[in-house]
Amino acid sequence: MKENDHLNSVSSSEIEKCDEDVEEELYSYPDSDFLVTFNGEDDPEKPLNWPVSIKLLNTALYGLTTFAAQFNSTTMSPTTSHLVNAYPIGHEVAVLPTCLYILGIAFGPMIFAPFSEVNGRKIGVLVPFFLSILFTIGTASSDSVAAIMCTRFFAGLFAGAPVVSSGGVMADLWCPAQRGTALIFYAFFVVSGADFGPIISSLVTEHSDTAWRWPLWTIVIIECFILTLDVFLIKETFGPVILATKAKNLRLTTKNWGLHAAHDEYRLDFKEFVTLHLVRPFAMLATPIVFFIAMFASYVYGILYLVLTTIPYTFGMTKNWQGTISTLPMIAMFTGVVIGGSFNIMWNQRYAKLITANGGKPLPEQRLPLMMAVGWLMPAGIFVFAWTNSPNIHWIAPFIGISMMGAGFFVIFQGCLNYLVDTFTKFAASAIAANTFTRSIFAGTFPLFSEIMFKKLGVHWGGSLVGFIALGMIPIPFIFYMMGDKLRRKNRFIKLIT
């Protein structure tokens, strides 16, 4: 009996020792042996090394998705009179569907930036885009003013995902020397969507005073077509998620359950969400650099939407243009944007050489000379538009003014964005979120008073008021060109939030 007890004791000890040996052996391997990474900088699975054709396809598809989201932002601007005819509301209420959509976009970065970082660009953009389509269908099917307003806000909120997160795709796909040009072409999609929305909308509503739903169904069809292309043709571009998917496939094929990617260990908790994505963007607005640059970019963005939503009204006042013809000046705006984009592309080539000479380190202040040289076109164009928009002056004159506005707008807007990214490289997402929030607030509120302003002051002085404020902001890039580096080094608050 004692011998059996002794044998049992020995067996138990040996088993425990064996378990300890196995455990020690199992955990003695370094974590790097189980960590899935890219196979060097030249790994073909890395998005930066994809064929140019694949990069261009993904850039174009994300650009089209953003085009549709921006198209939706202005698609209801020509339908204000139709809403007044359909419901017992005034003009101020009828313009709210456009404003609420843009205000919804203002809050998108706070939600969808972390969502795309956890789930990847494709899911992080396409799922909210699909939900935006559903809410747009809800607007088109609404029978009450309250339902229209509510669904428009949420359509804009979810549309904030492609508007904001798609920019990160450019960073995934293109190296720094190419990224500036890629971002310019991407920005063309952003602005052209807002430009062409009213034109198409006025076409489909021209022959009916109550057909305010038709533009919404039109954009739903366009968005569904683009979403279908996205689902089948877009590839995931976010490196950490690509590696997590690769690790999952390797675990299934090798049965080695220890294989994992660094992204598998990432968990976004509530505290991190609040600190990084809610508090930091607003905290950054308290710094002089972010505040004044964001205000400059936001004001010109607000002017863009002010012009886009009131151009038909102003040309109706001065030249009695009605329907689709009253929206054609928006083509002049897009022409100006293309010209401004050409300036940006040429300057980016010089900037790339400066970065190379500086050892690859960003030079934020070198983003500003183009704004200093061309930014004056924005206020100058506003004055030309305002004072040549008269019955006795040929229409080409205000069109030239609108094109000047478009060129100046694009140079300022893109320059401000690039300056913030170069200044806060590590926390560029927060800087962009702060900029997106403020610009959407401006764009969402300017249309509320624009028509009333032109009605009370007239086209000449109403436009001049906007132009004088824009003129007062022209010194901003000059100030930061001379003092930007000094402000960054002396501002303790920047160090605190970064």
Swiss-Prot record:
One of its GO terms (biological process) is spermine transmembrane transport. GO terms for molecular function: spermidine transmembrane transporter activity; spermine transmembrane transporter activity; transmembrane transporter activity. Signal peptide: none annotated. CDD domains: MFS_Tpo1_MDR_like. It is found in: Membrane. The chain crosses the membrane at residues 93-113, 123-143, 153-173, 180-200, 214-234, 288-308, 327-347, 368-388, 393-413, 427-449, 461-481. GO terms for cellular component: plasma membrane. Keywords: Membrane, Transmembrane, Transmembrane helix, Transport. InterPro entries: MFS, MFS_dom, MFS_trans_sf. It is a multi-pass membrane protein. Its main location: membrane. It holds the Pfam family MFS_1. Belongs to the major facilitator superfamily. This is Uncharacterized MFS-type transporter C947.06c.
